[in-house]
């Protein structure tokens, strides 16, 4: 596994029933999101784990977005022989994620990243 970190405060959502995770990144000029198409997470004695399937969505403060790494995904799906069912799941989940961005629901709801960040500061940092 690899480690990834941001320089800015961030809030991360992992899902048991969705094939993506969402990182809300708090910057001076707005909230950015980096979304990974990935397996649902599992937790074991070592860490929280998931498989990253290369496809990503970067969402800007105005909620415009860009799908990233399509070429890398296409290369890996051939090289690693992703089964048809897996490819279908990943495309469906990518569409669900786009819908969440476009409809501004879940982590993309107005103010949600800051609400969760403030909640973290109150409940964890003030102990």
Feature-to-residue mapping (PLM):
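Phosphate/ribose-recognition catalytic cores of enzymes acting on nucleotide-derived substrates
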Residues: 1-42, 55
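Intrinsically disordered, low-complexity N-terminal regions enriched in serine/proline/glycine
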Residues: 2, 13-14, 32-33, 64, ...
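Generic alpha-helical secondary structure signal
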Residues: 24, 77, 121-124
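Juxtamembrane/interface motifs at transmembrane-helix termini
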Residues: 43, 86-88, 108-109
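A generic structural signal for short coil/turn motifs at secondary-structure boundaries
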Residues: 44-45, 77
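Short loop/turn motifs at secondary-structure junctions and domain boundaries
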Residues: 47-51
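A hydrophobic, small-residue-rich beta->alpha segment in the mid-to-C-terminal subdomain
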Residues: 53-99
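Cysteine/selenocysteine-centered motifs that mediate thiol-based redox chemistry or coordinate metal-sulfur cofactors
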Residues: 93-127
């Amino acid at each position: 596994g690899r480690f990834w970190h941001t320089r800015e405060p961030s809030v991360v959502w992992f899902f048991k029933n969705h094939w993506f995770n969402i990182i809300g990144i708090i910057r001076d000029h707005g909230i950015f999101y980096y979304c990974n198409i990935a397996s649902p997470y599992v937790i074991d004695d070592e860490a929280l784990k998931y498989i990253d399937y290369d496809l990503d969505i970067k969402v800007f403060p105005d909620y415009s977005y860009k799908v990233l790494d399509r070429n890398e995904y296409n290369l890996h799906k051939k090289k690693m022989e992703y089964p048809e069912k897996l490819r279908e799941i990943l495309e469906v989940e990518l569409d669900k994620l786009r819908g969440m961005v476009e409809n501004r629901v879940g982590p993309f709801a107005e103010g949600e990243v800051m609400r969760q960040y403030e909640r973290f500061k109150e409940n964890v940092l003030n102990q």
